[in-house]
Amino acid sequence: MVTVEERLDNLEKKVEKQAFQLRLVQQLAADYDRFGLFDQVLAYDLSEKQYQELRELTSQYTDKIKNGEEVSLHNFTEEFKRILKDIEKEVDFEKFISLWLKGPEEGFGFSKALHNHFFN
């Protein structure tokens, strides 16, 4: 049986996630080029923590490329999956990672350099 405290905790987590997603939607007005990207974040129901961890992972790998270090799509994908392990929805990781890095239709993603390294 679920306690009142557990229900309140679950509700608080849902409200936090919805508040984060609302902030993303508000950012669309200022950053329409990333609409497709934010749309994916919302579609997969990411939390702010997951979103920030993905941004940090992307920055780390982008820095590695700039420093001439060897990086692999396999390792990046494994870390990407680890961050998103709690997602309840089925994720097409190849599509999501490509969109995350490059952006929709040559738009603005979070690391075009990393996208080009992995997919070109």
UniProtKB/Swiss-Prot annotation:
Protein name, per record: Uncharacterized protein YqxJ
Gene this chain is encoded by: yqxJ
InterPro entries: YhaI-like_sf
Organism: Bacillus subtilis (strain 168)
